[in-house]
Structure formats: C-alpha cells, structure tokens
Amino acid sequence: MKQLLLSFLLIFFLSDVAVAKDSFSSLSEAQVKSLVCRKWKLTFLEYKGKKKDIPAKVPASYLVFLADGKLQEFEGSKKYDGTWTYHHETKTITTIDQDGTEKHKIISLNSDQFVMNGNYKGFSFNMGFKKAD
C-alpha cells in the first residue's frame, strides 16, 4: 500500500511539474510580454538549491517592466532606470541598467509569480518575485 501511495504521489508530482512547464512554454511572445509588464517585488533568492526569503527588515526591491521597453528598479528609496527586451526563442530577458547588460533566463512566470536567473560576480542564482501592482 505504501508503494502504491508513493508511486501515485511521484506520478502526480511529475505530471504537475510537466504541466507547469508546458503552460509557460506554450505561451506566445505577446502573452509572455503581457505577463512580464507590471511591478514585481523581490521576495526570495535561491542559490545552489537553497531558497532564502527576503527579510521584512530589508528595504523592498522592485522591478517595473514597462511595455515600451523601459525598466525601473527601486531599492528602498533609490530609483534606477534602464531598458529591457524579451527574446522568445530563448525565453530570456536582457536588461541594460546601472549594472550593465545582463541576460536573465525566465524559470517560471504566471500572473502572480515570476522567477528568473541572475548572476553576480560569477555566481548564478534565481530571483523570485511576486506581483506588486
């Protein structure tokens, strides 16, 4: 009975992951851009499989992707402007801002959550955002 339950849970988990992956990969370029264009609040960072929530005492960080290709970054009371482009074939967003030019692979995206990868001084990590608008 335990093996049956374990098998069922494994199949359920794998099918759930496949559906989630397919739902993002089946979106058109216009649909992805429409989902990206909003205000996002940074809620977690993930490095080497370890997820760390952003503490409430840390000043909030936001990204605002505008439909005209402009990008606004807010870190506490500081604001930085930049630009962004989306590349549908590779599911990447390229940003140009005070940190230079960076390419971010979209890991997951829906109307409430957005996860993309980032790099800092040679370290690759994932950034998780929640819809803020």
Regions found by a protein language model. Give the residues of each.
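Lipid interaction determinants
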Residues: 16-81, 88-133
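Sec-dependent N-terminal signal peptides
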Residues: 4-13
